[in-house]
């Protein structure tokens, strides 16, 4: 305790006051942070709290030091005498006070002498009387009984005795104790006054609650919580507060709320605080309308025990896991000195809960008070949030929902397929791309495709690694997801209504267009100028290729949503092969996409009305009715369980232990997709063959010569694309346009490549291409095409079927003029890879934004002629099973970084395996030249090249034999070296025999093939062995 301010004769500078006791510093001690306190106040605080009283930094008693200059300054201040109440008016310096008190005339002993009384000490039983200074009758022998003088025998010149001094010291000690007790009484009275104020406030709250009527579940209830600091922290965070002076937009949602509670902290008890508690008072200080800074200071300065009065909202339905389910809104928060962790309050929302704004955690220092405080408001059951902070405008377009998924065991899958975006660097969120229909998430029903996952179990998720780690945690059986979705996202019911209306209008327009086309037989002549321009544009190879690519990218991106729609239908439907409804959708969806991606394109004939006439010219009313039914069927299929938006990205399996099962499912899907695709293609090809044959048989007979040239060129091109075994690099290059088309459209048509000329569908495919080219050539008769070379071969081919077609293919192997070949290679609707993009450019205006225009017509034909072609389908399926190549799923990466899944033939893998096998067979048994040659390592030699190798080997063998014979003749002709020659010959023969033994042993040990053994062990006509024959490679 310091010196009381009342004792000083002059005003004291506030800098000389102690912050703990509020009095003038006595024996000042300074902390390492520069704060000065009284020694008697600071030492107990440092021992017990281990922290500076101003909460700035930790503190230890050994770190304190005295401030001697400050002590000297305080000692020079003038104070009043301790006996001022007795009449002493002197004021002396503080360091002279003790000497003055000892000799003050107003002290107890001095007062006796000044009244003329006896100056002797009080000894024995002598006690001075009230009326005079003489001794009582019990006085000593020198008393006044003998009539002596008042001084008695002590004498006048004597001072006070030792007893007098002892009594004086005793009196001073008692006075000091009395002053200390008075100070404690004052502090106790102040403390009880504060408690009384708190209790009165509680009583007023209770009275107000009781007077407000019966309490309903869901209202606020007051709670009183007593807290004590542990390690200088209370273990919870607060947010909110009344707007400060910088923010004049004050609302009724003021208040201080608990945002987070530290685990195992002082506030984390059964009777402690809970998240979203509204703090009303702290040690009697009202905080209901306080700012955030005032609340922080109140908790800092609060003395233990800290009594906190809170209002707590009781939920209508308490979840089983015992956590609060209140709504928490936060715009900005400031970290207080209560804890040092991030401030984050999660909103526990029930399924019907309205959207809430984004939850943005902040970690700010105490000096950062410029942010707007949090505005909080509680709502009843079905009320919507009407007042949002000004800073939350950017989050008004999103809807937030917290979903809890519980699983019985860790092996049970949640059923969520999540993906992350790579095309936008700013957006690094995790999105739900698919929900398994029979999973936990699907049964819950609150998570939709396209939802963004913000938090998992209260932890922010920024990348896929964090999401996989949290979702695949085996120990966690309860997963709480905070998801966000656009609030303006179209409702599924509204989409269905709009789609139905659009399809009705489209149906009427298409039927009207078909009728008009059927009634105008001269429509072909109207379309001729346009086709001539396109034909001229495709004459130049460079111009044609560039234009095709431009059309492909532009149209693909224009109708990107439609392409995504159809690709997502197929891929989503293929996920559940056991479902009947999904299987039916997959059947029709596959027919759509595959039929639209094969080489049987008829865009020009569709625009000119030729194909439409062939379908509807017989019975328009009946065909229109069937067409309308097909439209309705397609709408139902599209609206039942399919989704318009598909997020094309790489998926992340939540359960990483089932990779093998996924691969097995993909293999089954591949087989099923192939069967469905082949079946639909065969039906459509047979139908088009029959339909177009009936309508345009006379045209084929007139223009057969030109058609044969077109067909031959395309067949040769297809042969190059299919016979890809000898040129694996060229296959990727030639087929790149198909995948480029898929890239621009963000989807991949699921087509299956077939080997050429080995099955009935291949023959039908070629025939149908000729038919379509015949219609194209018929409309281009004005472009200089000659019709004098026409024959009746085409009609005979159509009548005789597949056998005649195979014969005609042999005749069509003749050479082509360069000009016709170039034209045929670059016609857009004859290209199997640019057909899907070129199709959009020639669709009528009323159907340009609806990609399934042509696919509906294909479906109509497929359904109409399905039953009549069952036998043909069975034959095609049997022939396709033995001829179709194996396909596999590939994950491809586009130029912008996005990924997509497509099916590629496994020919590359087969070629690699063949090369490795050849390399293994040739290892250790080839010649030195072949071993060192990099060009021949792993290369596959074709049949023609192997024939050339044999010819070269024979030529080399003849050359060596000739050289050997000439050498022997030279040796025989020289008699002078006869003996030496024989010796040399013997040495050569012996060395040859030795080498052949080693070589044969080596060859047999290294598993040399029979052909190579025969080649290396061959003998020349004169009996000598040939050792360096050219290596012959066996066929794998």
From Swiss-Prot:
A Pfam family annotated for this UniProt entry: PDZ
Biased composition (Polar residues) is annotated at 736-750
Q: Which SMART domains match?
A: PDZ, RING
Q: Which UniProt keywords apply?
A: Coiled coil, Metal-binding, Repeat, Zinc, Zinc-finger
Q: Where is the composition biased (Basic and acidic residues)?
A: 548-566, 726-735, 805-819
Repeat is among the record's keywords: yes
UniProt lists compositionally biased (Gly residues) regions at: 129-160
List the PROSITE patterns: PDZ (PS50106), ZF_RING_1 (PS00518), ZF_RING_2 (PS50089)
Q: Between which residues do disulfide bridges form?
A: none
Coiled-coil segments: 655-689
Q: Where is the composition biased (Low complexity)?
A: 774-799
- What InterPro entries does the record tag this protein with? E3_ubiquitin-PDZ_ligase, PDZ, PDZ_sf, Znf_RING, Znf_RING/FYVE/PHD, Znf_RING_CS
Q: Where is this region: Disordered?
A: 129-161, 515-590, 726-819
Please give the superkingdom of this protein's source: Eukaryota
Q: Where are the zinc fingers (RING-type)?
A: 18-56
Query: Do you know which PANTHER family this protein is assigned to?
Result: PDZ DOMAIN CONTAINING RING FINGER PROTEIN 3, 4, PDZ DOMAIN-CONTAINING RING FINGER PROTEIN 4
* Name used for this protein in its record: PDZ domain-containing RING finger protein 4
* Protein species of origin: Homo sapiens (Human)
Annotated gene = PDZRN4
